[in-house]
């Protein structure tokens, strides 16, 4: 009974939401069953208190530095720049972090917060598996129980990460309902949380869900743009012309964008999954085929049919095929501050191959969508322009898919 509002798309939203806590312009909010309201309020209060605690901040910074491997390099991709013949291209190397992706930034922060709250059990959802691996890693580090929910289609696509999670001590629950992907994994994780809220922290992996998650996850990832801004100023003596990042839920992108939002001359470009076609169900481009609605706790752009039912999605990348986008991205798009485009499966695969062959870097298929937009855009730019592409993760997990799709 209590689970229906979690997955339902609603097209209405309260008036004057701009003045309410937890909104980004008209987007965001807290649309959950009453059984979860107290848990979210507890989490919000704990996070606000933690932000004021100098020791909490110092412990996060220490673990990011000593355990995760921050700061990550900002690498000048000379070969790719020369090949494309336009803007100078830098790569923000989040793929070099412990566990292989940006996800560890958020997991360390939320893991410390869960411990501070006295929770001894962590649950998480995962699509590509990187958030599941990072959650299992942090749970092992802090001595916590960990259960990861993953759609059975993603389990099939990401066998390596499933084994990594189990090796780290996590229980992986394969979800066979619905489309058997990330949306369905989130549904099951939320059902678990409703049942076990006193002992369990839901370690949500993106800037999705009900307040305070979009704000909190963004805060844990803003280190990406904080570093990148200092690094590009040191390397070039000026701000970049553009920042490009892939957008599933949108955590790596908002992390890469955040410190540049106030710099109006810096273009912020998010790249969604264009999939294999423009018809509903053939892609996961929310701004191309979606409309505002409420899904799994937040009001944002959602892929939905004419009846308000959640539409199917497709992407070669398991981490980009979620039907909704983080509310802060919706607000940035509506304000005209960020631009959102789409790269197809074929374009992402070609970009992955190009980066591997020019720079010796195999990006995750998620990140390859951002590389694809760089490949399209950079040749049209001036040689004096500077582009930063956020390489959110490495492609080890995708080798099976790459071998199957590229066939060489």
Swiss-Prot record:
Cofactor(s) demanded: pyridoxal 5'-phosphate
Domain of life where this protein originates: Bacteria
Stored SUPFAM superfamilies: Tryptophan synthase beta subunit-like PLP-dependent enzymes (SSF53686)
Gene3D superfamilies, A to Z: 3.40.50.1100
PTM sites of type N6-(pyridoxal phosphate)lysine: 103
CDD domains xrefs: Trp-synth_B (cd06446)
Membrane spanning residue stretches: none
Gene Ontology cellular-component terms listed: cytoplasm
Pathway stated in the Swiss-Prot or TrEMBL entry: Amino-acid biosynthesis; L-tryptophan biosynthesis; L-tryptophan from chorismate: step 5/5
Family: Belongs to the TrpB family.
Subunit structure: Tetramer of two alpha and two beta chains.
Function, in words: The beta subunit is responsible for the synthesis of L-tryptophan from indole and L-serine.
Name of the protein in its database record: Tryptophan synthase beta chain
Gene for this chain: trpB
């Amino acid at each position: 009974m209590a689970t229906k509002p979690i997955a339902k798309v609603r097209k209405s939203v309260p008036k004057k939401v701009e003045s309410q806590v937890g909104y980004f312009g008209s987007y965001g909010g807290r649309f959950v069953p009453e059984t979860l309201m107290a848990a979210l309020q507890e989490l919000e209060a704990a996070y606000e208190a933690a932000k004021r605690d100098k020791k909490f901040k110092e412990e996060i910074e220490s673990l990011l530095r000593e355990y995760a491997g921050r700061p990550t390099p900002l690498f000048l991709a000379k070969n790719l720049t020369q090949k494309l013949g336009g803007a100078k291209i830098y790569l923000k190397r989040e793929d070099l972090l412990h566990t292989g992706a940006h996800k560890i930034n958020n997991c360390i922060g939320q893991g410390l917060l869960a411990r501070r709250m006295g929770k001894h059990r962590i649950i998480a959802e995962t699509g590509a598996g990187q958030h599941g691996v990072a959650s299992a890693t942090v749970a092992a580090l802090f001595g916590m129980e960990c259960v990861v929910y993953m759609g059975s289609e993603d389990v099939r696509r990401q066998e390596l990460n499933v084994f990594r999670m189990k090796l780290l001590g996590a229980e992986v629950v394969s979800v066979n309902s619905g489309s058997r992907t990330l949306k369905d994994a989130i549904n099951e994780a939320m059902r678990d949380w409703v049942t076990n809220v006193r002992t369990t922290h839901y370690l949500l992996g993106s800037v999705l869900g009900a307040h305070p998650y979009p704000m909190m996850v963004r805060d844990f990832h803003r280190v990406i743009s904080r570093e990148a801004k200092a690094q590009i100023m040191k390397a070039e003596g000026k701000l970049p012309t553009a920042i490009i990042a892939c957008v599933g839920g949108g955590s790596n992108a908002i992390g890469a964008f955040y410190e540049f939002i106030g710099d109006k001359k810096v273009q912020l470009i998010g790249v969604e999954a264009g999939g294999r076609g423009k018809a509903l169900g053939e892609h996961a481009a929310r701004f191309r085929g979606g409309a505002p609605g409420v899904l799994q706790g937040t009001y944002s752009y959602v892929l939905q049919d004419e009846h308000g039912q959640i539409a199917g999605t497709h992407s070669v990348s398991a981490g980009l095929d979620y039907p909704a986008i983080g509310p802060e991205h919706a607000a940035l798009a509506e304000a005209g501050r960020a631009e959102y485009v789409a790269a197809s499966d074929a374009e992402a695969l070609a970009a992955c191959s190009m980066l591997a062959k020019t720079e010796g870097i195999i990006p995750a298929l998620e990140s390859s969508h951002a590389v694809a937009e760089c490949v399209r855009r950079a040749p049209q730019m001036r040689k004096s322009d500077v582009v930063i592409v956020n390489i959110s993760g490495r492609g080890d997990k995708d080798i099976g898919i790459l071998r199957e799709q590229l066939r060489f």
